[in-house]
Amino acid sequence: MPHLPHLKSFLLASALTALTLSPAWAKEKFKVVTTFTVIADMASNVAGDAAEVSSITKPGAEIHEYQPTPGDIKRAQGAQLILSNGLNLELWFARFYQNLSGVPEVMVSNGVQPMGISEGPYNGKPNPHAWMSAENALIYVDNIRDALMKYDPDNAATYQKNAQNYKAKIQQTLAPLHAELV
């Protein structure tokens, strides 16, 4: 039995080596950071299991005047894509984004027709909460899908399918409301 200690050492070394090696199937997920939770929810529906989606802000946070932390900057710097709303919703974002290098950003409100604000200090300006319109929400989904497909082409088919399913779910949810209003 003199070989038993050597066998145990060999097995232990082999097991430790196997644990430290990263197999091809354990590839890290594509990392997406959004400026707030609504976009994170939409992006998660489009990404499914193909990407890891997180929001800079937490639920209930004041999105307009948010004060990013150093941890927010660090997390965003580790992303492979940042999704923002635009339309002057995230007043803090331009300065925040200057602290990042090499992380692409896509404004998911591109192409929407925002309603105008008709009173108060923002009278005449576009309402930045454009996702609240069903038609605009579908544009957001398309923009998120296109961004994910562009920056993570290996999972393009997944993003395409998930976006199609998510849009159908949105339309199905809204169909009874449209029927009542028409």
Each predicted region: which residue ranges?
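Short, low-complexity interaction segments enriched in Ser/Thr/Pro/Gly
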Residues: 5, 24-26
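Bacterial N-terminal signal peptides
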Residues: 9-20
